[in-house]
Amino acid sequence: MDGADGTDLANGTDGRGGGLRAHIGSFTSGGGRGITSAAVDPATGALTLLSATDAVADPSYLTLDRDTGVLYAVSETEQGAAAAFRPTPEGLTALGPAVRVGGSGPTHLGVAGRRLLTANYTSGSVSSLPLAADGSFSGPASVLAHEGSGPDESRQERPHAHQVLPDPSGRWVLSVDLGTDSVRVCAPDPATGALRLHGETVLRAGTGPRHLAFHPGGEVVYVLHELEPQLTVCRWNAGSGQLEPIDEVPVASAAVSGAVRAYPSAVVPSPDGRFVWAAVRGADAIATLSLADGAERPRLVGSVDCGGSWPRDLAVDPSGRRLYAANERSGDVTWFDVDPLTGQPRRAGSVAVPAATCVVFV
C-alpha cells in the first residue's frame, strides 16, 4: 500500500512543477491506492501518475473547494468519515486526521459556504460539517435523516442518500435519494449551518435516482437513475427552491437495455451546455445526449465504449475538450477527445489506477 505521505509513482520523476493536476479516488478495500495524483498533459490530456496517499480508507468521492483550494474526500466505510487535503505539485498533504460525519457509508460530498456536506448512503442521511477559514474541520457534524422507501425491496428498503450538492445560487442544498425515488431540497440554517428540509420532489417509483447535475445556465437539472437507464429533466427555480420534472430521456438504447442490465452512475454536462454525458455500468458505455439549438430536453445521439469495465464516474477537464472515465472494475482511468460538433467522445488513452472511482481536476 502506498504511504500516507505520498508514495512516488513516476519512476524517478518527483512531479514538481506547475500545470493541471488530476486527483483520482479509489476503493482501498478493492485494491486501490487511496487518492492518486497525476499530471495532465495540456496537449494530449494524458495522465502521468505522480504519487498516492492512503491517509483515508475508501476515498470513493472527491470534491474541490475552489475558494480555499482544499480537496475533500469521503471515506465510504461503515464508520463514515471525511478528510481534507492541500494539493501540492507533488500530490496531497493532509490537513489533520479524518473526521466522522455522523452517518454510515458516505458516497458523495460537496462544499456549501463554510460547510462540508456528505450524502450517507447506508444510513440514509446527509451531514453538514463546519469548516475553518483554512478549509480544515472546525466542529462536529449535524445530521439530517431521510425517511421513506421504494418498491424495489432489495435496493429501496429504506432511504439511501447518494449525492448532495449546493445549487448554483448557493441558497439551497439538493440531496438525491436512491431508496426513496426523490430529490430533497434543503436550506442551511443561517445561524448553525444545519440543514432544514424545504421540499421534496418525488420521481417515478423504482427508478432509483443516483446523481444529478445542473446545466451551466443554472435553470435545468438532469437527474440520472441507477435502477433504470433513464435521465429525468427538471426545471429549477432558485428563487423558490422548487424542482419540477418535465421529461424522461433514455441513456441507453432499447437494444442495449435488453441485452444487459444497465446501472447508470454519473452525469456531466459540457461546459458550453451543448451536450450531456452519462456513464452506464453493465453496458460499460458513455452515452452522449445533445441539446441542439438550445433545447432544454436532451436526446440520446450515441454511445461509446468506456474503455474499461464499470465506469463509476465521469469528469470533464477545464477546457471542455476531454472527458475522463474512472473504470472501477478494470482499474483504470480512460480519457477521450470530444468532437466539438457532435459531442461524441473518442478514446485517446488510459492509465492503470486500481479500483478507480472518481476524478477531480485542480
Please annotate each region the language model reported.
Residues I24-S29, A73-T77, T118-Y121, D167-P168, ...:
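Conserved beta-strand positions in repeat-built beta-propeller and related beta-rich domains
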Residues G31, D58-S60, G105, H160, ...:
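Beta-rich catalytic cores
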Residues L92-Q163:
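Asp-box/WD-like beta-propeller blade repeats and closely related beta-sheet repeat scaffolds
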Residues G19-L20, D67-G69, R114, S169-R171, ...:
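Short coil/turn segments that connect the beta-strands within blades of beta-propeller domains
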Residues V260-A325:
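Loop/turn-rich, solvent-exposed surfaces of beta-rich toroidal or solenoidal domains
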